[in-house]
UniProtKB/Swiss-Prot annotation:
SUPFAM superfamilies: P-loop containing nucleoside triphosphate hydrolases (SSF52540), Protein kinase-like (PK-like) (SSF56112)
Species assigned in the record: Homo sapiens
This protein's name: Myosin-IIIb
Domain Protein kinase stretches: 27-293
Function: Probable actin-based motor with a protein kinase activity. Required for normal cochlear hair bundle development and hearing. Plays an important role in the early steps of cochlear hair bundle morphogenesis. Influences the number and lengths of stereocilia to be produced and limits the growth of microvilli within the forming auditory hair bundles thereby contributing to the architecture of the hair bundle, including its staircase pattern. Involved in the elongation of actin in stereocilia tips by transporting the actin regulatory factor ESPN to the plus ends of actin filaments.
Gene symbol of the encoding locus: MYO3B
Principal location: cytoplasm
InterPro entries: IQ_motif_EF-hand-BS, Kinase-like_dom_sf, Kinesin_motor_dom_sf, Myosin-III_kinase_activity, Myosin_head_motor_dom-like, MYSc_Myo3, P-loop_NTPase, Prot_kinase_dom
Active site: D156
Amino acid sequence: MKHLYGLFHYNPMMLGLESLPDPTDTWEIIETIGKGTYGKVYKVTNKRDGSLAAVKILDPVSDMDEEIEAEYNILQFLPNHPNVVKFYGMFYKADHCVGGQLWLVLELCNGGSVTELVKGLLRCGQRLDEAMISYILYGALLGLQHLHNNRIIHRDVKGNNILLTTEGGVKLVDFGVSAQLTSTRLRRNTSVGTPFWMAPEVIACEQQYDSSYDARCDVWSLGITAIELGDGDPPLFDMHPVKTLFKIPRNPPPTLLHPEKWCEEFNHFISQCLIKDFERRPSVTHLLDHPFIKGVHGKVLFLQKQLAKVLQDQKHQNPVAKTRHERMHTRRPYHVEDAEKYCLEDDLVNLEVLDEDTIIHQLQKRYADLLIYTYVGDILIALNPFQNLSIYSPQFSRLYHGVKRASNPPHIFASADAAYQCMVTLSKDQCIVISGESGSGKTESAHLIVQHLTFLGKANNQTLREKILQVNSLVEAFGNSCTAINDNSSRFGKYLEMMFTPTGVVMGARISEYLLEKSRVIKQAAREKNFHIFYYIYAGLHHQKKLSDFRLPEEKPPRYIADETGRVMHDITSKESYRRQFEAIQHCFRIIGFTDKEVHSVYRILAGILNIGNIEFAAISSQHQTDKSEVPNAEALQNAASVLCISPEELQEALTSHCVVTRGETIIRANTVDRAADVRDAMSKALYGRLFSWIVNRINTLLQPDENICSAGGGMNVGILDIFGFENFQRNSFEQLCINIANEQIQYYFNQHVFALEQMEYQNEGIDAVPVEYEDNRPLLDMFLQKPLGLLALLDEESRFPQATDQTLVDKFEDNLRCKYFWRPKGVELCFGIQHYAGKVLYDASGVLEKNRDTLPADVVVVLRTSENKLLQQLFSIPLTKTGNLAQTRARITVASSSLPPHFSAGKAKVDTLEVIRHPEETTNMKRQTVASYFRYSLMDLLSKMVVGQPHFVRCIKPNDDREALQFSRERVLAQLRSTGILETVSIRRQGYSHRILFEEFVKRYYYLAFTAHQTPLASKESCVAILEKSRLDHWVLGKTKVFLKYYHVEQLNLLLREVIGRVVVLQAYTKGWLGARRYKRVREKREKGAIAIQSAWRGYDARRKFKKISNRRNESAAHNQAGDTSNQSSGPHSPVAAGTRGSAEVQDCSEPGDHKVLRGSVHRRSHSQAESNNGRTQTSSNSPAVTEKNGHSQAQSSPKGCDIFAGHANKHSVSGTDLLSSRICHPAPDQQGLSLWGAPQKPGSENGLAQKHRTPRRRCQQPKMLSSPEDTMYYNQLNGTLEYQGSKRKPRKLGQIKVLDGEDEYYKSLSPVDCIPEENNSAHPSFFSSSSKGDSFAQH
């Protein structure tokens, strides 16, 4: 484990506790001084000299060893300084019963801490004067300067860590969390310290891993300590420490409670210490020159004595209880304490009094404490804080992972975790519905839910996780814009489905988009802007000097993004935020998987839309026709055509004219200026709408899981709905009408799940429950959606009439919509009002018919299909679905799950690029479709996705209309609570049963909790009761066929079930491991036996093969020798014998693979003519001896284990009476290449030639017997028997022809059971073992 504090590396054994001295030999405890962070502090006396000291006694707890060691190392390393406590040493007191103790002996500071001094004075109605405060701060600054000069950051400067001596000295203590740097410029990034004194940059390190800080964090802490010296407590002292971590970075720098009561220098000193930007904050050295501190110069001794007198006076007062503020260390896990200890109720259901005032009071108090989340049973209320909070870090993600909901404060992560756990436990799809007004924080809540689900999903593929996290940012850049009430308002509906494996691993995602507000492309209301992406791309291309490449102007803004202020271009070129957002969008494209060519095409289409907006039209007056139009600014036309890669002439023709087909004839008619402008705007809207739809489809293609994974495992989904919120502007048009109808549908969905279905089941199951009244908006939805007299049906009907106007539309509404929800205001012709669930809204009917028709001339489509831009061709070649979006396409790409395990990703099928997934019921004729019909089908499609899953609701509330942080408008919040039915929801969640489960499903799901695994309990009431009682639940009810449970019951049951399954999984893991090990052992043994059998068979085969080769060679050699013997016998004594060739020895060595050698030798007499006829094959010794009494034939035999040589030599009885040794010459056996030992090629058939030359009657050839092993002695016996038998039948041979075994042969000696033949005049060794060169060569061979 690496040490937290830089220079020293943590090792539990580094301290060497056993080597430390025993303190009892030197120190003796006198009394208790106080309690430290990790142990008590005592006053001790030195037994040797009687000096006093303070000792901090600590138990060597493992998780504190690092801080103990850090303090020890720093104290030992740090030189002495008057303003830093002295260190006398560390001791270890061993105790085997209760464990040893560490003693840190320090300088005794009898005066206590400055905090105790200040509190004591305040209790007596006094306070420290400014001179004394400046003296204490001066001493603290000197101590900090000493630390910083030695490259040490204290990181826990506070009043309790500034001690005083009885003489008035100021000492810094407690270095447990100090950091020692390796360089004065090196910064730290560990969030550690006591929360009230922690600097903002230190807190930021917990949330932002690229943040860091330097030694000036001690300056901030000293500033807080200065306030503590003045007021007695640090700022926010009455708040829970966890909440201070949220407040400090966001609040302005704190000040004294009553700054006017203190001098200007003191206030200025505090303000300098508490500069939030630490880069601008002064260092300790600079603060020593501050006027407030410089006032101490020359008065140090006087102020020291005065402080000592004050301390002396305080000793006579009653002691003040010491307030401890515990340190927090983010590297050490901790849990946030229960909110009930320091705040109001987390769950409104637990309130004793349920009324509007109580609920509003609860929400307001929690919002003031930045507790923006509150439960209503299993429903989460989220108040928009209008500021960034530090409660969404990975540390908080770990807190909200598989724990009970009540274990932690309410959080958006808890709702995400509840949906995830239900999905994994119940194997059922989930749906998280986020609703609320525009600007209430729905989009950000959706971001956080996706973030937490990716954390819980633990994607094996890190790239997939990054892709999913980038999806929202990319889609929102194209689908969000700035409105009058929200700077990041969603102008489309989004349903994001995150797909998981059955084990809960995220494997992909899919987005469904609904009803994009395309009209915003061409026109925006006052104080509103176009879609974000237009500003991002303009700023990015301007920064890259590429505006000219896309034919965009650098001075005057395009008409589609210009506003009434005229500052758009200045904002685009000067604001860094736009440029950074452009870089972020490029990063999103790259991470998700878009190619550079695709991104470039997207940019060209966006630039083309902006250039199209600059095209203007003018009327052409002629003698016969005055409604003709032309394009006066040809440059804008040329720019648009160039960027879109189409012909400018064709584009102009498509804009200024249109074709009409009548009775088979095509008539070209000119467009008026107004109609040409409408065609231009319709073209821009179509381009942007289809481009947005293509981006969504492309994202879905890049993030889709492998089909084999889905089909094999049957994955599950968690859907997140982020839809545009309820809107009510000063002028509301057709867009707001569609948005508010969609919100009515979501509210109806909420009412059905929370109220209607629950109370209906109470009646059906015979449950006695008090009915809860709620506002049912079903009649209002019928007014909108029913046919043929619903509002949308009437709108479509009027849109089909060419002569219809907006006035006739309003009149038709008034004639047919006769209900309390519709009214017509007097005095306003083109307006109508609707009473929505969220309040009354007045709509302007101007342009509603044209917006609903949303016609796109076919001439424009034809021109755009001729573009050289492949993407643009694709946008207008793919048909639209019933929801108005492009049909999904497939391309040759790598799916998101390609990096999942191989058994999931096998068998991918490749399809052709741009292959359209055509469904007859999806594709439709765009000429007959209207925006209202698209919208109706979008709602149907959205609900079909939502009803599949189990819902989880997040109700976002906007606390004020000014978007101000910490501002709570009771009237606005109460109106939203009433409209969304939160008050009724509190009541039904308190009284009702939100979970109704069939007996069969309940028993099947939870029977593990009460029955053993091999039992199969019946799906009866008794089984359900047994499970519920075993789980120790109460307040549940059984109906006729269902179990009725509270919202918290299911959570408890799921936690218990996970615990049981966890234990089962552990047992299964051990069992599977044991079975696997045993199975592997058997397989290994079987394989070893098989290997042995294969090896044995091979060895046998190889031995037989080699033996066969050796046998054949020996047979051939024996036949050759036999032929030679026959020839010699036929010549007899009549052949002249030369003295030099009387006895010749032929030795032949046959080499075989595997180092098997056979030595064959023969001694025979040959005539001079025979030696010549052999062509040198048989060589004779240069010193050939005379005929010996006995010439021996040397034979060798080979066994499978190696080569054994059995050779004989002749007795040394020559004819002349001299001892001669016949020479032996080795010849290799002929190999496949026919090479001799010396490499000379042998003539084929040379041996056969010898046999043919001496054609004599062959005597019966005796086959030589092979020795099977060295231990076999029967060969010699059989050989002797054979010789005796042959000798008895034949005439005695001559001495040179008789085959005998030499008694002196070494091999024969080891085999023969009889005594060796005695040597006769054996003064020389056999030539086979002689030291001659030839003999050595043979032996080596």
